[in-house]
Amino acid sequence: MRIALGIEYNGTDYFGWQRQREVASVQEKLEKALSKVANHPVEVQCAGRTDAGVHGTGQVVHFDTNVERKMVAWTMGANANLPKDIAVRWAKAVPDEFHARFSATARRYRYIIFNHALRPGILGSGVSHYHGELDEKKMHEAGQYLLGENDFTSFRAVQCQSLSPFRNMIHLNVTRHGHYVVIDIKANAFVHHMVRNITGSLIMVGRGEQDPEWIKWLLEAKDRKLAGPTAKAEGLYLVDVDYPEEFDLPRESIGPLFLPDNLN
C-alpha cells in the first residue's frame, strides 16, 4: 500500500532535504524513523527538495509498504523516532497512482524577514533579518510583474538542472505584520533558488535602490547576473503543496507559527 505523509521541519541543522553521504538530511532522518515503524527499509519521495537551511511546514511525501498499520501508528511511531526538529503532521493511505512530486499541481513558499534595527534572539534561525527600512507596498507592486507564465531565467540559479526556465506564477503577495515582512509565493513549480533570488531583488526594491518596474525589466532581460543577490536560506519555508481533490489529502494550517493561511 502507499502512504502519504505531511512533514514539518526546521532545516537549520540539515544539508537540505535530499539524502546525502556523510552529512545530515531531513530525508535520511525521516526514512530511518519510518523504517523502524515498518520493520523494513523505507524510501520516501517528496513534493519539493528544499535546500540546506530551508524549512518546511507543508512538505508532502509518500512511501510504499506491505505492512498493515493504523495511520496513528505511522504518525506517532515516526515522531517517537524523529529528532525534535522534524515532525509528521498527518498520514493517509493513497492510491498507487499518487506521487508526492508528480501529482502536485502547485507549490507555495513563504519568506519571512524580521525587519528591525536589531537582530532577533528567539527565532533567529527561522527568519531572515534586514536592519534597514523596507517598503513592503513597493515590494508587492514589483512582485505583480512576475505573475503568469514566464521565463524565469533572471531568477534561476546557474547550476539549475531544470530543462525549462518557464513557470506559472499564481500569486505573489508581500505583507507586513509588525516587524515581520512576509513574501508569499505560489507557482505550479519553481526553478532552483527561484524564491530566494526573487526575494533578493524585491528587497532591493523595498529599500529604495530600484523602482518596482525594475522587476519587469529583469524578467524580460533573462540574465541572472542583472538581478539581486540570493536571499539567505533561513527565512524560507515550503508551506503548502496542492493536489487534485480526488486524493482528499488532509489540510493543516500552513503557518509558520501564528501566520494565517490568508495574509491579505
From Swiss-Prot:
GO terms for molecular function: RNA binding; tRNA pseudouridine(38-40) synthase activity. The active site is at residue 51. Its EC number is 5.4.99.12. It catalyses: uridine(38/39/40) in tRNA = pseudouridine(38/39/40) in tRNA. Substrate binds at residue 109. CDD domains: PseudoU_synth_EcTruA (cd02570). SUPFAM superfamilies: Pseudouridine synthase. The keyword Ribosomal protein does not apply. Keywords: Isomerase, tRNA processing. One of its GO terms (biological process) is tRNA pseudouridine synthesis. Formation of pseudouridine at positions 38, 39 and 40 in the anticodon stem and loop of transfer RNAs. PANTHER family: PSEUDOURIDYLATE SYNTHASE, TRNA PSEUDOURIDINE SYNTHASE-LIKE 1. Belongs to the tRNA pseudouridine synthase TruA family. HAMAP family: TruA (MF_00171). Homodimer. This is tRNA pseudouridine synthase A. It comes from Vibrio vulnificus (strain YJ016). The lineage of its organism: Bacteria, Pseudomonadati, Pseudomonadota, Gammaproteobacteria, Vibrionales.
